């Protein structure tokens, strides 16, 4: 789900894969959003970034087929402030011993990896399952930790202030219930990215 630590985990996983003699290449699926003018809207007329239709599936499928065929691709970078993909000369070609580490909220959705054989995929579900309780009877919801993470991230990288992020959160949560949680059992493993000290650290940035 959103702000579960997918990007951080993919980079940490890449470090460990490299230590075992493999060559990992992290790939953020966020760079495969459709351009803003093609983004679907919800029932309130707001852009729905959480639905699978917000992803440029045709481009992603084409790039994956080329990579598996040994061809070189140009990797897009999505400019969230401008609302469009940009190409900045970043190339990628996979050789023997290379591992593509793809991360994104729809990575477990079968539509995202349609046409890719199951034996070429190892699926990991990541979430921040906060284990801190307020007292013996009240726990801190796991979504609270992710919301705080997202407030900090959006302010730093996407040009959104806290009010904008909080206003979008109900739509994000609806998207998770519809497009993400139904596929969590499809994962080969699950990883808890919550850190016991993180709320006290990131609160000053939120």
Q: Which residues fall in each region the model found?
A:
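Post-Walker A helix-loop "phosphate-sensing" segment adjacent to the P-loop in P-loop NTPases
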Residues: 15-25
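Conserved NTP phosphate-binding and transfer environment spanning the P-loop NTPase/kinase superfamily
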Residues: 110-206
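Glycine-rich phosphate-binding loop used to anchor ATP phosphates in small-molecule kinases
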Residues: 61-119, 169-183
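Walker A (P-loop) phosphate-binding loop of P-loop NTPases
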Residues: 3
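Conserved lysine of the Walker
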Residues: 6
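Structured core elements
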Residues: 25-28, 50, 100-102, 123-125, ...
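Hydrophobic positions on the alpha1 helix immediately C-terminal to the Walker A/P-loop
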Residues: 9-13, 28
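Conserved nucleotide-sensing/catalytic segment adjacent to the nucleotide-binding pocket
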Residues: 25-27, 34-83, 99
């Amino acid at each position: 789900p959103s702000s579960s630590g997918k990007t951080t985990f993919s980079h940490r996983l890449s470090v460990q894969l490299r230590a075992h003699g493999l060559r990992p290449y992290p790939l953020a699926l966020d760079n495969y959003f459709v351009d803003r003018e093609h983004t679907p809207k919800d029932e309130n007329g707001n852009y729905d970034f959480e639905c699978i239709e917000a992803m440029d599936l045709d481009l992603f499928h084409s790039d994956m087929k080329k990579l598996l065929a040994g061809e070189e691709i140009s990797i897009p970078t999505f400019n969230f402030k401008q609302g469009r993909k940009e190409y900045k000369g970043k190339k990628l070609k996979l050789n023997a011993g290379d591992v593509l580490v793809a991360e994104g909220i729809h990575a477990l959705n079968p539509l995202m990896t349609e046409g890719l054989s199951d034996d070429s995929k190892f699926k990991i579900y990541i979430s921040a399952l906060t284990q801190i309780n307020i007292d013996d009877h009240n726990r801190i919801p796991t979504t609270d930790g992710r919301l705080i993470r997202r407030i900090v991230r959006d302010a730093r990288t996407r040009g959104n202030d806290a009010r904008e992020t909080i206003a979008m959160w109900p739509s994000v949560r609806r998207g998770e219930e519809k497009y993400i949680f139904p596929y969590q059992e499809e994962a080969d493993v699950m990883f808890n990215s919550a850190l016991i000290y993180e709320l006290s650290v990131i609160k000053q940035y939120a």
